Structure formats: structure tokens, C-alpha cells
Amino acid sequence: MAPQERLLIRGGRVVNDDFSQVADVLVEDGVVRALGRDLLPPGDTSRGLRILDAAGKLVLPGGIDTHTHMQFPFMGSQSVDDFHQGTKAALAGGTTMIIDFAIPQKGSSLIEAFETWRNWADPKVCCDYSLHVAVTWWSDKVKEEMKTLAQDKGVNSFKMFMAYKDLYMVQDQQMYAAFSQCKEIGAIAQVHAENGDLIAEGAKKMLALGITGPEGHELCRPEAVEAEATLRAITIASAVNCPLYIVHVMSKSAAKVIADAKREGKVVYGEPIAAGLGTDGTQYWNKEWRHAAHHVMGPPLRPDPSTPGFLMNLLANGDLTTTGSDNCTFNTCQKALGKDDFTKIPNGVNGVEDRMSVIWEKGVHSGKMDENRFVAVTSTNAAKIFNLYPKKGRIAVGSDADIVIWDPEATRTISAKTHHQAVNFNIFEGMVCHGVPLVTISRGRVVYEAGVFDVTAGHGKFIPRQPFAEFIYKRVKQRDQTCTPIPVKRAPYKGEVITLKPRETKEDDTAGTRMQGHS
């Protein structure tokens, strides 16, 4: 694929997170070279310049999907959107970068998992990508590998699971240790916030009651299970003074916990996803098993139909910060592994292609947020948190030319029949969305235009991320300087100190226990 060296995007409304302006955008060698009015006279196509007319359209920074799982081996199967198909679909939806997860098994090397995911992705990706790395166990080796990943491999985010007991779940003391190391190396800690112990017990209870269908998935993981874990994670992170990022915020209860924590000054960020913003958990009670199973994911969609609107309100007002898709797709025949037991249904839904349109429809078209906030929650905030800004997440001189020409008035109807993902269903089936990407530009190349791709596997590149992102660590460093407890200066105690007698007999122990119980 020959390089496309020069583009002029003419006459569009350039939208960044902080302001909008009508301007031309000149792109050369994969970056934005100039931004302003009437950069070149009409008809100047010299030296290979291609002019794209964006009059009446919006020119947006390419979307950054903070949460994907391409070709992920999980629950006995593997997600069907691989790094090629999944990233092509992302481009069709206006997303020009994804951040996927390298997830080692317990006892396995984090660095080896990272290299495995790199080997899967590098030859296939059609857009730029980066990797979070999961911490699924704890040891001195894990601690050292986190440091190596942050310093040498371009990883500045590590995810801990509070769910998936006996698979990925870590205990509180392990989470405290991992959070402490994140702070030491300048990374941001991420958590999947659900109480894994309660989920395990709840699943047993549902199956004992004869509830084997997809509704059992939500019934054993109610909102309280998500909210409790969210509060616990925030409490642990606050004790460490470590910045925290809550992935896939799915419930009103968990979102309220995050909003309250932000009002208390905690450095915490919440990530709702396209699924939770675009549909709800009433789907689990659908009479058709396959329809219900298609929506199974963890944490589950919530049956309260007001949840998507509530999450969008908090996303619009700043209580929630970014958006991902948690794209982890399994075909119906894979979901059918759990046809007689909901605990065996592979968890995951689509969203990488439809995230931008769903958020525009439910957020901007509904009047909840403006175009600038849309750019913030789909691109810029992620770039700032994960230390990609201003190369990503902004249209400015020197920024990467990851750009979308967006038609806010056009509509499209989402359907599995027309989407570009490998999965054979779509949880947003039939949704009419205002807001359609007309042209997607990745690394300075037009890779998608009017429904046609011009991109090959390997076009995208791995983007390393440096630690100590200023957007989050400025506050953390200042708090270390000003909020560290100090001892009270006082004169030493010089009075009498009693002598404790050693307990030598079982009777002494019993007596001591009785005395303590009546003190």
C-alpha cells in the first residue's frame, strides 16, 4: 500500500474537546502540518495533494476505544473478531485506535503474555493499537515485570480482576500490592469491579433453583455486587494514592460510587461502554434463548431500563470520563456452550464498530452533550489518561493524522447484515443512529470512504505509552508532598507500664478470651 503523503480536508468544522472552528486541515507524512482558513487556493492539486471536501461536515479526532478483546481465548473458546477484522470494523465506525488487553493465566509471565498479544496483533492490525496488561496473580516476579513493561515496553496501565474466581481474580492484599507498584512505576491501575466470591455463591444458588438461562447471569451479579467492588477498589487505591480507572461501568449504583468519589477529590475515572449506553438488561428475559444469550457479558447489562440514560447523563457532566466497547465477540454457536448452564456462556458483546454512532445518537442527538464533549469522551480523555495526548485525541499541528469526517445529520440502521465485524449478531440490531463517519483517515491515509476500505493488515502500529501521564500524576505527586501523614511531636511517656504474663495453658487462653469478651 503506497503512502498517501498529502491531504487537504477543506471547509469542515474542526471539533476538539475544548473548541470548534471552521478550518482547513493539511496532512503530510501522517501528521497534521497546518490548520487554518483557505490554506491553499481551490483546485491546487499539485505534488500529489488530494482534496477532501468537508463543507457542512464535522472533522473529528479519530476515536480511541479504550477497551477491546480481539481474538481473546476465554471460557473455552476464542472471540471471533481478530485483530484484522476487529480493527477494520473500528475504522468503519470512526475509531482509529484501540487499546486491547494482554491477559496472562495465573502463574504465567506478564511479559510473555504481552509478547504473545504483540505477535498476534502486529501483522494484522489495520489501525494503531496499544495494550493494557492484566495482573492475575502476585509475586516478586510480577512486580519486577510490571516495572519492565512500564519502562521498556510502552505499557502504562495494568488491570486487576475482582471477579472470575479461580481464573483471574485477585484478593484485596494482592490488589493493594499491585496498586502500590502501579504508583511506583507511574502507571494507572484498572479494575474489573465485581465481587467474585458473591458471584460464585449466587451462581450456585441460581442453578439450585433451576435457573439455567441467561437471566441467571444477571441475577447472580446484581448491581450491589458491582457497586461494592467499585467502592472497595476506590478505597484501596485511595489508601495507596494510586490513580484508578474503573472499566465497563454498567450500573447506576457503581456510577454513583464513582461520582461520589470524584466529588471527594479521589483520582478515579469511570468508563461506561457502548453496550451499557445503548441497551439494557431486560434482554436477558427474552423468550428466545439465543437473543438473551447474545447479550451476556460481565458485568451484565442492567434490567433497569433507565440505566443507559443515567450513565449517559454522568458521561455528559464529567462524572464518567471515557468510553470503550469491551468488544469481545462470540458467535451464537459459541454462546451455546452454556445452553443448559448460564455460567458456561462465553461473556462478551460487540461494539467496536458502533460505539461512536451509539454515543452520538444517545448523547449528542438527544441533547445530553455537545460535539466537544463527544470528542472528549470518545477520544481526547482517553489520550490524556493513557499518555497519548496530543499526538492522539486532538487535531492540531504536529498531531497524528487520525481524523474522521463525520456527518451529524446522516442516519444509519445498525444490523448484523451490514456491519463489518465477524460476529453473526449485533446487540444494537435495528437501532437508527444519527451521526455517520463518511471518511476515516488513519496515519495520514484515507482508509475508509463511502463504505469502501483501502487498508491492508499491518497498516496500524503498536503505540508505546510512557509512564507518569501528567494528566493524572500531577495531582498524585502533589498529594504525596502535602498529604503524607506526619507523626505528632510529643514528650516520651515515662510512667508505669504493666508486664504481660505469657499464656502457657489452654485454660489461660480460655480465661483470657472470657475476660476480653466482658471488657
From Swiss-Prot:
CDD domains: D-HYD. The modification Phosphothreonine is found at residue 510. It comes from the Eukaryota. It catalyses: 5,6-dihydrouracil + H2O = 3-(carbamoylamino)propanoate + H(+). InterPro entries: Amidohydro-rel (IPR006680), Hydantoinase/dihydroPyrase (IPR011778), Metal-dep_hydrolase_composite (IPR011059), Metal_Hydrolase (IPR032466), Metallo-dep_Hydrolases_sf (IPR050378). Zn(2+) 2 binds at residues 159, 192, 248. The keyword Zinc applies. GO terms for biological process: beta-alanine metabolic process; CMP catabolic process; dCMP catabolic process; dUMP catabolic process; pyrimidine nucleobase catabolic process; thymine catabolic process; UMP catabolic process; uracil catabolic process. The keyword Magnesium does not apply. It holds the Pfam family Amidohydro_1. Zn(2+) 1 binds at residues 67, 69, 159, 326. One of its GO terms (cellular component) is cytosol. Its cofactor is Zn(2+). NCBIfam families: D-hydantoinase. Homotetramer. This is Dihydropyrimidinase. The gene is Dpys.
